[in-house]
Amino acid sequence: MEKQYEKAANAPSSIEVRGARVHNLKNIDVDIPLGTITGIAGVSGSGKSSLALGVLYAEGSGRYLEALSTYTRRRMTQAARADVDEVLYIPAALALHQRPAVPGIRSTFGTGTELLNGLRLMYSRLASHECPNGHYVLPSLNVAAGKELTCPVCGVHFHAPSAEELSFNSQGACRTCGGTGMVHMVDRASLILDENLSIDAGAVAPWKTLMWSLMTDVCRAMGVRTDIPFKDLTDEEKEIVYDGPAVKKHIFYRPKNGSNEAGELDFTYYSAVHTVENALAKVKDDKGMKRVSRFLKEETCPDCQGSRFSETARKPHLRGISIDEACRMTLGEITEWVKGVPESLPEEMRPMAESICGSFLRTAKGLMDLGLSYLSLDRAGSTLSTGERQRMQLARAVRNRTTGVLYVLDEPSIGLHPSNIEGLCGVMKDLVSDGNSVVLVDHDTQILKEASWIVEMGPDAGSDGGNVIAEGTVEEIGKNPKSKIGRFLSGNYPRRVFPVIPKEEIFSEGCIRMKTGPIHTVKPLDAEIPKGRLTVVTGVSGSGKTTMVLESLIPGLLAALAGEKLLGHVLSIDPSGIKNVKLIDSTPIGINVRSTVATYANVHDELRKIYARSEGAREKGFKAGDFSYNTGKLRCPVCDGTGVISLDVQFLPDVEIPCPSCHGSRYGKDAEGIRLVNKKGEARSLPELMDMDVNHALGFCQDMKLVKRRLEVLRELGLGYLTLGEETPGLSGGEAQRLKLASEMGRAQEDTIFIFDEPTIGLHPLDVRTLLSVFRALVDHGATLIVIEHDLDVIRNADYIIDMGPGGGEEGGRIIACGSPEEIADSPKSITGKYLRPLK
């Protein structure tokens, strides 16, 4: 015992990192305390994620995986090994990434959290089951024992369905929709191209693209006049066009080769609807689906009503309801319902019921602690926000009470209202109390204040970052003059940057008004949005912000501008002179490594033209097209201009490494030899310039008027640290949003509305200041801005706030307060208002 105690007393207290050089890290040495919460702060691009994920997670997970067989490792995604001299005393590590993948069509909140597994087990083992003759048998232990059930009414013997038979991704799937809850239906409104055209002139769109041109001749043989405008046909004729029977007709037709001889044959009539249905049945790939999709619309499955379950799976009843009805409940509602399950069963079944229900409730508690009680189990996974998916990921990782694990959290505050962050902090403290260590990368001062130790990276981004500029407790960082986050942690900074617009002037430029009916958990709304102002939509997670703005306002405005029918739940909308609607969201830009910052910002094309005019290029006969790393002669022949090559390593996953020929520059050796000399006498090749960040490239491009102007816009957007050759799919959500804005800056925008969905994702408080300046510049040019946001500094600088709530799910969905930040802070109903003080 004495030896064991002595060993524990001498146990290491910190992870020791020595000589870390991942990405932009400058050979740093740093100690990360064990058994506590450590925050890693710093401006965007300063090296926070490089330290947390590139070093700590890569080493912690890599060493654990090395203990597994090569056969097992081959089937696991592995982080690249860190470029570091030494990492000592690191535990096995789990990482929760900033942007979890968007789930597929078969995923729901219930499947993603595995709550549905527990629910299926309940309905299989504990429910009343229906016999083949329609009689219900009371709950029995025979189901768990694998025995047959006997109907007390008709005496028939049968087996209860297993949990597998209650899965909509397996045997319990609805036969009509295959377990997706949605079916493709023919969109009749898309079948007629133009009612002023005749059928001979191509009025029936599917017959032009999906069917032989002879169908107009067959239609004529069906008794339909094909030489008059479609609108002038009788109802009977239109019925034949849309839904006529598939009968054979003997027709005469003129061959397309110009021959005067008429052909004749027997041909089956395919109505417009049948044409689309026939083409859909034959679809084998995405290309084929694309041809048909313009004539289709998605509708709720008429058989399962969107529940995804088969009729058989919907038959078992527990506490008076079926499994599909249980899935329609929110997490908060079903948690209360599950608590009552054991008491509703016979005495002998209660121990088993308490075990099954207890497991369900433990999983549910972790999710509810993270503020997800408003989500229903049948909510489609693809409709969940980034923050919701990240909290699901966190709940999955922490529900097993492990000890001695290093949890690396990459911006866990994404998408969280200040009130939800309190729940997140509670989960992190629980992890530490179980003997784990937590490292979190974040900018949110509310969550950073919970850390026992903070490591701040910097001082700036990219090549100007990668150093530890400050470390210590929250109080020590707050007093450290070298720290950039310190004043935000201590609260010693001005909150309001821009002047307050008087209440009577808020709507002086106009008003966009929208009325909606109920949808999801959102109640009927009557919203007024001031034109030419910065409006921030706030509220706790699930309060209806996304539904109001992204699912109602945007489709409503687009329909009104196109002169089309409004969506069913959008009752009326007044655009107030708006002609352009631009959604600036955080979806990745581009889908492969060929999309870079320079190409997206329209800088690369201009640089290619400039380099093609250089003396070296003219001597060798190179044109602008030759400088393209996608198709040009000067691209690297080894990697074909991607900058990376993929290695097929036997027994292990494929490994991507920088191209050994161009070292990631994407260009061949000939491109290196063509150098452009600026007015300062500095010479750079295009590959060298593409490897520079925006700030340094600006210094070289001062005499290139158009390039300089476009690079200055990127710098003003706070993207000066990005290299010109950086791949756009790898940018953070916040970086992607600001890059999308680059082409919009400096224009008159009086008729444009910009809608931002949480633009502060990944932004340091200093970067938020830059973003606010961008917002103000757009407003000064006449733009109307609507921002869905949780960041308190953005909310405090709004001209107008629409606060949704008061809670999430069924407890939200209403506009509970509108007005200036001061008015929201004074509102007793507003949860957001509680966190807005101080305002200045």
Model feature map: region roles:
Residues M1-K840:
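Conserved phosphate-binding elements of NTP-dependent enzyme cores
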